[in-house]
């Protein structure tokens, strides 16, 4: 069994597709089909078998999942999280990050004063959005880019207040 800190979330079952038990898989890899090259597991570390059927216009994958063969079985998988082992991921280039490593990082201002933390990272198709939770518990959504976040380390990110927030 693997602890969740050794696992990286790389996909989620969005819904079922058709009557043969196929599922629509939203892959967090780039390109989306890269997920098929990994040894996939669930939260408990049990192996997952996925076979690609096709890819839809939104870039989502239509797949078979384990031994699921009916729509009723597939409907129960909505929201099912798919992971891979952190150790199986490739080394990152400079200025590349795994989303799992950004979640809950401290956010500092340009004077290195802590002002909040990353609460969540969202993506609705037009790029990553960082949900910030400030120390006063208010939240704000900002695009994840160098303009707003010029410095990113494994321990913190710096929010550029010069940019209109």
Swiss-Prot record:
What would be one Gene Ontology cellular-component term for the protein? cytoplasm
Q: Which GO terms describe its molecular function?
A: ribosome binding
Short name of one Pfam family: RimM
Q: Where in the cell is it found?
A: Cytoplasm
Give the source's domain of life in one word: Bacteria
- Span of domain PRC barrel: 94-165
Q: Where is the signal peptide?
A: none
Q: Which UniProt keywords apply?
A: Chaperone, Cytoplasm, Ribosome biogenesis, rRNA processing
Q: Which Gene3D superfamilies match?
A: PRC-barrel domain, RimM
BP-aspect Gene Ontology terms: ribosomal small subunit biogenesis; rRNA processing
Of which family is this protein a member? Belongs to the RimM family.
Q: What does this protein do?
A: An accessory protein needed during the final step in the assembly of 30S ribosomal subunit, possibly for assembly of the head region. Essential for efficient processing of 16S rRNA. May be needed both before and after RbfA during the maturation of 16S rRNA. It has affinity for free ribosomal 30S subunits but not for 70S ribosomes.
Assembly and interaction partners: Binds ribosomal protein uS19.
Record's comment describing the protein's domains: The PRC barrel domain binds ribosomal protein uS19.
The name under which this protein is listed is Ribosome maturation factor RimM
Source organism of this protein record: Rickettsia typhi (strain ATCC VR-144 / Wilmington)
